């Protein structure tokens, strides 16, 4: 689970 700099959540 990661959260990138542009506030896009990747699950």
Curated annotation (Swiss-Prot):
The keyword Nuclease applies. It catalyses: Endonucleolytic cleavage of DNA to give specific double-stranded fragments with terminal 5'-phosphates. GO terms for biological process: DNA restriction-modification system. Keywords: Endonuclease, Hydrolase, Nuclease, Restriction system. One of its GO terms (molecular function) is type II site-specific deoxyribonuclease activity. It is an enzyme of class 3 (hydrolase). Its EC number is 3.1.21.4. This is Type II restriction enzyme PvuI. It comes from Proteus hauseri. The lineage of its organism: Bacteria, Pseudomonadati, Pseudomonadota, Gammaproteobacteria, Enterobacterales.
